[in-house]
């Protein structure tokens, strides 16, 4: 699954666990956090970009946030769902007997209370402002129901001015401006809008950026619907038109190579995209 719609679907499956208490928690990722989260309450879930966030509260105890990066194949399964061939990285059992299991994900504890700097693969010393910023990032996320078009446009204009000399491929992959957009989505949007991936940001006009934003939103929504159809056993037509294709939809031979500062493998049509 492509990251943005996959994260949204995962969030929709787990958000109902809000306000429930943790009665048991285990797994190698949790053990490396070096905290006791028994009896903590799930205050809220949210997602922004490529992360799902879980805020935990407990009376007279510090507040924590668990951030999950789903990686390429990560999953959070709910209830009786299990992965018999994979070991869970973290398991949380709640007071209503619901069990949450994390698989193949990067799980990090964000601690806004610490005084000394802590940074490992499992614990990061952060600030309350940084956590609030992650909540604000939802407003810029094209896959999020809290997406705010006007705020996004204002934020995007700032980014265009700052990164004018970058190629558009690198800019579309910048999570500060396009949270949740990955390599597949940016390639499809660039083909959809007939824009060369090597084109400089400063050479792309406002109608082109409008096309890119609308195309990204359209593709994300189509992928989301296709995954929902797949879960119910229904068929959904193909969506991706250029990613890893040897020919574009019009039959032109494509180019596939690593480009930009991020060195990401990119496919494009040298005839259709200018």
Swiss-Prot record:
A zinc finger (FPG-type) spans 241-274. Pfam families: H2TH (PF06831). Keywords: Metal-binding, Zinc, Zinc-finger. SMART domains: H2TH (SM01232). InterPro entries: DNA_glyclase/AP_lyase_DNA-bd, MutM-like_N-ter, Ribosomal_uS13-like_H2TH. It comes from the Viruses. CDD domains: FpgNei_N. GO terms for biological process: base-excision repair. This is Endonuclease 8-like L720. It comes from Acanthamoeba polyphaga mimivirus.
């Amino acid at each position: 699954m492509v990251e943005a719609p996959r994260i949204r679907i995962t969030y929709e499956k787990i958000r109902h666990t809000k306000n429930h208490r943790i009665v048991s928690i285990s797994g190698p990722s949790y053990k490396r956090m070096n905290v006791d989260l028994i009896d903590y309450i799930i205050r809220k879930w949210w997602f922004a970009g490529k992360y799902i966030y879980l805020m935990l509260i407990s009376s007279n105890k510090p507040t924590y946030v668990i951030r999950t990066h789903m990686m390429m194949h990560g999953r959070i399964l709910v209830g009786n769902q299990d992965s018999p061939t994979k070991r869970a990285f973290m398991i949380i059992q709640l007071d209503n007997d619901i069990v949450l299991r994390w698989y193949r994900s990067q799980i990090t504890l964000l601690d806004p209370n610490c005084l000394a700097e802590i940074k490992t693969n499992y614990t990061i010393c952060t600030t309350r402002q940084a956590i609030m910023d992650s909540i604000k990032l939802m407003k810029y996320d094209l896959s999020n129901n809290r997406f705010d078009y006007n705020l996004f446009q204002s934020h995007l204009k700032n980014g265009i001015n700052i990164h004018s000399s970058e190629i558009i491929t690198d800019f579309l992959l910048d999570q500060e401006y396009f949270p949740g957009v990955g390599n597949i989505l940016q390639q499809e949007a660039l083909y959809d809008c007939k824009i060369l991936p090597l084109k400089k940001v400063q050479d792309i006009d406002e109608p082109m950026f409008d096309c890119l934003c609308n195309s990204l939103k359209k593709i994300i929504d189509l992928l989301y619907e296709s995954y929902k159809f797949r879960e119910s056993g229904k068929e959904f037509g193909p969506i991706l038109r250029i990613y890893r294709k040897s020919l574009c939809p019009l039959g032109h031979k494509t180019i596939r190579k690593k480009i930009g500062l991020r060195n990401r493998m990119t496919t494009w049509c040298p005839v259709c995209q200018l």
